[in-house]
């Protein structure tokens, strides 16, 4: 709470805020964590996971709408959809899952910076 106001994460309304850098950066790179497909599940998600998944779906819709109108120079979309909401303890596995994305990003970013 700040000055009597409850604040929420800015990602709630602007989950991919590349547009805030328009005209202020030579190269804009955005990491989209909202568009990754979710994992197939056979168990019932918790109430918290249902709420969070709803937020992810809404965030994905916002990102898709934003990208339809404008785009950053590079959008990175790592395959994080296979992980669950509270899998922070799986940092090593999450980073390992991004290895394939890393090679593509290095190539594209190198081309952008060389231009």
Walk through the language-model features, giving the residues of each.
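Patatin-like phospholipase
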Residues: 1-115
């Amino acid at each position: 709470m700040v000055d009597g106001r409850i604040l929420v994460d800015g990602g709630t309304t602007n989950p991919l805020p590349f547009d805030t850098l328009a005209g202020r950066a030579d190269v804009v790179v955005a990491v989209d964590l909202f568009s990754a497909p979710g994992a197939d599940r056979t168990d019932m998600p918790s109430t918290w996971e249902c709420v969070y998944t709803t937020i992810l779906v809404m965030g994905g819709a916002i990102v898709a709408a934003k990208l339809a109108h404008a785009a950053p120079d590079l959008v990175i979309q790592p395959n994080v959809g296979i992980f669950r909401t509270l899998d922070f303890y799986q940092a090593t596995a999450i980073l390992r899952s991004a290895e394939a994305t890393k090679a593509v990003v290095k190539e594209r970013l190198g081309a952008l910076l060389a231009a």
